[in-house]
Regions:
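Acidic, surface-exposed loops and disordered segments
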Residues: 1-192
Length: 192
């Protein structure tokens, strides 16, 4: 299945129940690869996608959230923000652009580094939602979990240089929720 971007956006809903059908590796690989094509500040690529299929890890994610879809989905994506100053910019950007970007990151305190990394991680998460929909998969983006428990579940316990952007349950839908509706317009031109 392949949808246009507009179709994937229009059809995407939060789905919390899934069939038992496993997600083929090639489809999951495409979703993750497309998610990681998301733009990031300075192209610093300060987000990782942890692909969770192991039931024990999914059980730990459920314990961190009490959200059954994280336990029951065939796969869960944990979008992790690299909340420290990047060290690989010369390899990613070349020396001149890396020097400029490093100057920016050097001016940030720990809270600002975390905030900018989380913004990048949320871009990756949004791309993952649309990429999954385009492949015929349903998703449930979640918040409301204990971040330290999520980090522990994916092997990053005690790391203050990592943060969780979003935890996304994913699988083939066992339900088709109706469109929940939207306000007539949230668009604001120029200023409030």
């Amino acid at each position: 299945m392949s949808l246009t971007v507009a179709e994937a956006i229009a059809q995407r809903r939060a789905v919390r129940t899934y069939t038992d059908q496993p997600i083929p590796d090639d489809i999951l690989d495409r979703v993750v690869a497309q998610a990681l094509e998301a733009p990031t500040a300075f192209n610093a690529q300060r987000a990782d996608v942890v692909v969770v299929r192991d039931q024990a890890v999914k059980d730990a994610l459920f314990a961190a959230s009490k959200q059954a879809q994280l336990r029951d989905a065939p796969a869960v994506l944990v979008i992790v923000a690299r909340a420290d100053a990047p060290t690989d910019l010369p390899e990613l950007l070349g020396p001149d652009r890396a020097a400029y970007a490093n100057g920016f990151f050097a001016r940030l305190d720990a809270a600002a580094l975390r905030e900018t990394a989380l913004k990048d991680a949320m871009l990756v998460a949004g791309f993952a939602l649309i990429a999954a929909q385009g492949e015929g998969l349903a998703t449930s983006p979640t918040t409301g979990w204990d971040e330290s428990q999520v980090l522990e579940a994916v092997g990053l316990g005690g790391r203050d240089d990592r943060a969780v952007g979003l935890v996304i349950a994913m699988g083939y839908p066992a339900e088709q929720p109706v469109h929940p509706g939207r306000e007539a317009s949230r668009r604001v031109n120029d200023h409030y």
